[in-house]
Amino acid sequence: MGCLFSKERRSGGSDMGVSERIDVSRFQTPQQQTVFHVNNGGNEGTISQLNGTSDGMMGNGRGGGGGGGAQERETLVALYPYDSRADGDLSFQKGDAMYLLDHSNCDWWYVRHQRTGQTGYVPRNFVAKQQTIESEEWYAGKIPRNRAERLVLSSHLPKGTFLIREREADTREFALTIRDTDDQRNGGTVKHYKIKRLDHDQGYFITTRRTFRSLQELVRYYSDVPDGLCCQLTFPAPRLAPTRPDLSHDTQQNWEIPRNQLHLKRKLGDGNFGEVWYGKWRGIVEVAIKTMKPGTMSPEAFLQEAQIMKQCDHPNLVKLYAVCTREEPFYIITEYMINGSLLQYLRTDGSTLGIQALVDMAAQIANGMMYLEERKLVHRDLAARNVLVGDKISGVPVVKVADFGLARKLMEEDIYEARTGAKFPIKWTAPEAATCGNFTVKSDVWSYGILLYEIMTKGQVPYPGMHNREVVEQVELGYRMPMPRGCPEQIYEEVLLKCWDKTPDRRPTFDTLYHFFDDYFVSTQPNYAPPSA
């Protein structure tokens, strides 16, 4: 099943309940002057919230929820604007304040708008509780180091652009990421500083010479003086709005939708199972629509496959929104990725990408596959044609794994045996899967190695000049494709060849692959800059 764009959380800032304002208008961007705000929340509340004792707004916006009703005076602030898409949803603008009425749903909270008095559901990852670090414009949540660097290096941002993120290696620590130069031609440089906790959660420090009761206090201080950092903090790095959790609150559970709500506007491509279209839901929301050829599978099997996709929620997996199964052809409705398949992108607009962008995309794909690996889901058709490309952040495209409608939940033996007569994309399929039909997470790792070959060659067909039967025979005899031109030797030796190990259990995990690529350029430089004396 083909699909076409995590929930990255973006902090937006607010004028509601702000007790201190830091003016950085002297660092004017070409577009506009910007003022960012620092909430001056109490120390005790901030620390207990960071310990996870509050209602869980950390990370990707999930968790918490508890028993339903909430104190009406608990106030939320909107991080982004949101337009209502259906009855029961509530529209709002960035900075609007709302009272939290019910938080029992992990993706949609029921609120009352402070100004209008209207009630309705809002996507949880579009709001934050006031006077917590999640409501701060500079807080990025749990994002990879390389993503943080791309955010502060976005075009037209000044020296001192910064964010604070939760460290992946130690969730009790934070990291301060700062743009050290504003050289637009050379892209600027970035410094990272560890923010550590004091004993007994009494505060935070970068250097023991100066401690702070809260992260807000730390930001205020270093916005006035660098005091050992590379420069003053000047401007919170802007971040992309997160992916909507669903088309609307109603479609979260009722994801069988009437097909007359869909308008198919432009055909994007054909596949073995049907066509892919660009369209709109209710004339508002851009979506991708996969139409299944009649007779491809039963409604029961179709819904079983779609249920797997519906439950998957990761920034590097395409989000499934809804289905239409009341009549044929069946539809799958997913988020729309503006730049299409990675294969076509590599052959066209992406043909000029440098090694840093290619490595970053490899890390994103491995991150999405790591999510499937953790849930014992096998993709079975991982290839550049089944990875989709969205917008760029600092020159690096956002990529997401798609077409995992073929995915199967592995049983205890960790093997899925394909039915007799099933067809496989031979050049991407591991030997044990091609010859015996045995698919595992490790056969996906083999396919990932072939996908890397596609990335490094900018979309060349694997095993050039060889037909399928020859590929099967030669691979069985030990043949492996040579190192592509321009591919770093370390990537070929430590990743591609290991992904193509004849013994499945000796192939790396996607967790290993993700961290290899995520840390690829970090290994040549100090991980964190020490503050100067």
Swiss-Prot record:
Subcellular location: Cell membrane; Cell projection, Phagocytic cup
Regulation: May be activated by autophosphorylation. May be inhibited by csk-1-mediated phosphorylation.
Residues modified as Phosphotyrosine: Y416, Y528
EC number(s) recorded for this UniProt protein: 2.7.10.2
Cofactor annotation: Mg(2+); Mn(2+)
An annotated GO cellular component: phagocytic cup
Keyword tags: ATP-binding, Cell membrane, Cell projection, Kinase, Lipoprotein, Magnesium, Manganese, Membrane, Metal-binding, Myristate, Nucleotide-binding, Phosphoprotein, SH2 domain, SH3 domain, Transferase, Tyrosine-protein kinase
PROSITE patterns: PROTEIN_KINASE_ATP, PROTEIN_KINASE_DOM, PROTEIN_KINASE_TYR, SH2, SH3
Enzyme class: transferase
UniProt cross-references to InterPro entries, sorted A to Z: Kinase-like_dom_sf, Non-receptor_tyrosine_kinases, Prot_kinase_dom, Protein_kinase_ATP_BS, Ser-Thr/Tyr_kinase_cat_dom, SH2, SH2_dom_sf, SH3-like_dom_sf
Active site: D381
One BP annotation, GO: gonad morphogenesis
Recorded topology in the membrane: Lipid-anchor
UniProt-listed SUPFAM superfamilies: Protein kinase-like (PK-like) (SSF56112), SH2 domain (SSF55550), SH3-domain (SSF50044)
GO molecular function terms attached to this record: ATP binding; metal ion binding; netrin receptor binding; non-membrane spanning protein tyrosine kinase activity; protein tyrosine kinase activity; signaling receptor binding
Post-translational modifications: May be phosphorylated on Tyr-528 by csk-1.
Lipidation (N-myristoyl glycine): G2
Subunit-structure text: Interacts (via SH2 domain and SH3 domain) with unc-5 (via cytoplasmic domain); the interaction requires kinase activity. Interacts (when activated and phosphorylated at 'Tyr-416') with ina-1 (via cytoplasmic domain) and with ced-2 (via SH2 domain).
Pfam families with a match to the protein in the record: PK_Tyr_Ser-Thr, SH2, SH3_1
Keyword Transport found: no
Domain Protein kinase: 262-521
Family annotation (CDD domains): PTKc_Src_like, SH2_Src_family, SH3_Src_like
Protein name: Tyrosine protein-kinase src-1
